[in-house]
Structure formats: structure tokens, C-alpha cells
Regions:
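Conserved protein-kinase N-lobe ATP-binding Lys motif
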Residues: 5, 126, 144
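Active-site activation/catalytic loop segments of kinase-like enzymes and analogous catalytic loops
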Residues: 133-165, 178-192
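ATP-binding pocket architecture of kinase catalytic cores
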Residues: 1-36
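ATP-dependent phospho-/nucleotidyl transfer catalytic cores
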Residues: 5-7, 34-108, 155
Length: 192
């Protein structure tokens, strides 16, 4: 199953942040949390599971196949474990934040958002149910990894907030998600 995106969303008349915020507003109207594709409120557990499995696999690979590449990965491992644990801890502390708003309810989101709404077709396999900040963080992460342009990131955030302002809780989740090195895990998942 696919979703066809309206033509107006691909034109440059509306900013990317506004389009994503409108998408999240529509997605938040979905009244049921689809358990199979939901990550809402589960980032901490997912991140812990991913870190544990990743650490176990790298240790196993380095023991079974000792080579310079695996040695380099093992040398970097404490760094990635450390920043992963920092992100997990910050996320868990953020759950105690009481300054949240209607924008913090679950919505339809993307697995890894990168201007997906500019495409003519969105595949259902790319969608999930989560906190809208997931898409904002992944958009920012890609922009930072491609060619850091803080002005375009700030414009995106301003566009988004002109439609759907973020709460303090949302900002904390955004920071936690950006802190977690998911791009590192994605890279190694593709390599193996």
C-alpha cells in the first residue's frame, strides 16, 4: 500500500518544516496506537537493546575475525557506548519532565525521515507511530551529516513551530534523539 502526496506539498511555497508539522497534525488525529509499528515511549528500551546486541556482535566479530578493521572498531566502541548511554540516561530523565503539551501525543511518523514528504509516493513500510520529534531529529541528523548548515536547520525548526510549537518535553526528546548515535548503528547494520 502507498500514499500519494498532494502536489502542493512538493512545491516551494510551503517550508519543509510546515509540511512536516501539518503531516504530524493529521497523523495525531489517528485515534488508535498501532502496537505493531509503535515506538511511542519505547526509545529507551529500543536503544538499550540495540546497544547490547551491537556490543555483543562486535565483541564476537573481533574474537572470531581478529583483523585491523575489527581492532579499529573495538578501539571506537567505548566512545559509542558512552554517548549511547548518555543519550539513554538523558531520555530516561526526560520522562520525568512535566512541561508537555498536545504536541507530545503520538502521531504517524517515518522510520527515518529525510524530506519524504517531497516525494510523490510514501510507502507504508516507511511509516510508524511515534512521537513527532522522531522525524524532526532525523531530518536534523541528516542535514548535519550531509553538509552542516545551521541556518537551514533553524529555518526548518521555525517553520515547524509556526504550525506546531514544541514543548519543553519535546525539546528534551529532540536532544536525546540527536545525542543517540543511531547513524552509527545504521551504518554497521548495512555493513553486516
Amino acid at each position: 500500500m502507498v500514499i500519494k502526496i498532494n502536489q502542493f506539498q512538493r512545491e516551494n511555497t510551503v517550508g519543509s518544516g510546515q509540511v512536516l508539522a501539518q503531516f504530524h497534525q493529521i497523523g495525531a488525529q489517528y485515534s488508535f496506537e498501532p502496537q505493531v509499528i509503535s515506538s511511542y515511549g519505547k526509545w529507551g528500551n529500543h536503544w538499550i537493546d540495540k546497544l547490547t546486541a551491537f556490543e555483543r556482535k562486535l565483541l564476537n566479530d573481533s574474537q572470531e575475525h581478529p583483523n585491523p578493521y575489527n581492532q579499529l572498531i573495538m578501539d571506537c566502541l567505548p566512545y559509542f557506548i558512552g554517548i549511547s548511554e548518555n543519550a539513554i540516561q538523558y531520555f530516561q530523565e526526560s520522562l520525568y519532565e512535566k512541561r508537555y503539551d498536545f504536541v507530545d501525543q503520538g502521531s504517524i511518523t517515518f522510520h527515518r525521515y529525510h524530506d519524504n514528504l517531497k516525494q510523490q509516493v510514501v510507502w507504508l513500510s516507511d511509516l510508524m507511530y511515534d512521537h513527532p520529534v522522531r522525524d524532526i531529529a532525523e531530518y536534523i541528523r541528516v542535514k548535519l551529516l550531509e553538509a552542516p548548515n545551521l541556518d537551514s536547520i533553524l529555518l526548518f525548526l521555525q517553520d515547524y513551530e509556526s504550525v506546531r510549537p514544541l514543548s519543553v518535553f519535546s525539546w528534551r526528546l529532540l536532544y536525546a534523539r540527536l545525542l543517540y548515535p543511531i547513524h552509527f548503528y545504521d551504518f554497521f547494520a548495512k555493513k553486516n
